[in-house]
Amino acid sequence: AVSDDGVSYKHHSIVLEDEVSISFPIVYEVGEDKYMTIEGVKANNIRLFKALDFPYSWTCVDTLLTGPWSDPSIYKSGDTYFLFVSTPYVYEDAHIFSSNSFFGPYVEHPMNPVVSKNKRIARNAGNIFEMNNKLYRPVQDCSNMYGEKVRMMEILELSETTYREREIENSPLSFKQDGWNRTKMHTFNIFQINDKMMVATDGAPHNGKLQLRIVKRR
């Protein structure tokens, strides 16, 4: 889909077809190139795609991690890249892998699983992001069902040997009994267009299909 303002979109074309799964795409800029990760449960690996003609053409160039990991999100802190993933199907554990290169190899964090047996906060809901000098990890609350709520974790400590986070006060996000995301919400991705900070999210007011929403930061 294409847009002139980041709010209103029109479908353009299918840019990636895969026999396995193409959910949870996150795009990264490395030098002058653009790369993308997608979830890897059915493929049994986390693959890295490179844009040949951004954003219309992509090719798989590497495998970052082997195993049925879901919802990968990479964040760079200092000279270290951290790859956040969660375990599939039950979604109750979160793991971190680190590398001194975006392209790996990624090694397991000594505190894994950094979240253990907690369906409320284990599964990623979007990209790890920084705002007002604080680092955040949006998470899916899968306690009762898939994609019920999005909660927000503040990452207090992140290194190759340590990890600590806490849930913020206004969590779950934008949740009201009569709101647009009353029964479902499972995506929260921050992005910037020019000087505007925006969020791609979704929600359902009743037990129906999730609907995409673009929200501007005031």
Predicted regions and their residues:
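Carbohydrate-active catalytic/glycan-binding domains of CAZyme proteins
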Residues: 1-218
